[in-house]
Amino acid sequence: MATLQEKLITPIAAESTTPNNKITVVGVGQVGMACAISILGKGLCDELALVDVWEDKLKGEMMDLQHGSLVLQTHKIVADKDYAVTANSKIVVVTAGVRQQEGESRLNLVQRNVNVFKFIIPQIMKYSPNCTILVVSNPVDILTYVTWKLSGLPKHRVIGSGCNLDSARFRHLMAEKLGIHPTSCHGWILGEHGDSSVAVWSGVNVAGVSLQELNPAMGTDRDSENWKEVHKLVVDSAYEVIKLKGYTNWAIGFSVADLIESMLKNLCRVHPVSTMVKGMYGIENEVFLSLPCVLSASGLTSVINQKLKDEEVAQLKKSADTLWGIQKDLKDL
């Protein structure tokens, strides 16, 4: 006897079983779920997979998202502890990792995350060998290097979220000070995501007008308007948000969806993201730092050769040396 479905639907051709734009998010903590929501909100994928070791939380988040699928463009939302659920992903977003314990050294924190990534990355590669991996876990620059080493992927397919968010914060704060919209205020934060990031004051402009030409002291201690404070606020803003609400998640979620959109839609937009910078600006070691990069359907396809002042190059090199000081002592890579 025919089922209701068979009575209702007459098949004409076999359905495709392979998704066109599948995205996987590894880790369903605050950041992972903010990434998932932002990806779904932009309608970037035809299938979203969630993976974590936390089974109940994983199932709960999946069900909660599925129940909202009526108003989303993505109706297929899956989740499992088994990485088989991630098969055929185009982009894999890694947000998983361990948190720093009180008094723990940065090297020890990174080494513990290396041990986590030694499980995650081979599983990703097993089921989605043709994917691009976007690393969000902190410290993002070092863990992007770790991912590159563990995955065996070419460097254009391993990208760190890097300073995309730092630059967004920078533009927001400058625009607020100038009373204009952030999209009309252009500026870049490069280097390490975090305390040693580099504000490229020489490139800050509005409508092509260099702000440093109007105020040559901009970004220095001699500046009576104290624009340098804007960069300090960028660096401190994550700590401030964490102090107020316990974690940061929404801004990084929006930032990640922004990067994914550039890749899946082949937009060739320029973003400050973490890439392998050996051989650039006199950097001699295999470190990942943020530079202005072109993101397209192939991944990270080009780096923009931004003209930097000598002091900005020196700051970049200092960032690279700091990261290499930790990376060179990592074990089991």
UniProtKB/Swiss-Prot annotation:
Any single GO BP term: lactate metabolic process
Subcellular localization: Cytoplasm
A Gene Ontology term for the protein's cellular component: cytoplasm
GO molecular function, one term: L-lactate dehydrogenase activity
Binding site for substrate: 106, 138, 169, 248
Domain of life of the source: Eukaryota
Residue positions binding NAD(+): 29-57, 99, 138
Xref: InterPro entries: L-lactate/malate_DH, L-lactate_DH, L-lactate_DH_AS, Lactate/malate_DH_C, Lactate/malate_DH_N, Lactate_DH/Glyco_Ohase_4_C, NAD(P)-bd_dom_sf
Keyword Membrane listed: no
Protein keywords: Cytoplasm, NAD, Oxidoreductase
Active-site residues, record numbering mapped to chain: 193 (proton acceptor)
Residues of the signal peptide: none
Broad enzyme group: oxidoreductase
Pathway listed: Fermentation; pyruvate fermentation to lactate; (S)-lactate from pyruvate: step 1/1
PROSITE patterns given in the database record: L_LDH
Pfam families referenced in this protein's UniProt entry, alphabetically: Ldh_1_C, Ldh_1_N
Family indicated by similarity: Belongs to the LDH/MDH superfamily. LDH family.
Function: Interconverts simultaneously and stereospecifically pyruvate and lactate with concomitant interconversion of NADH and NAD(+).
Protein's name in the database: L-lactate dehydrogenase B chain
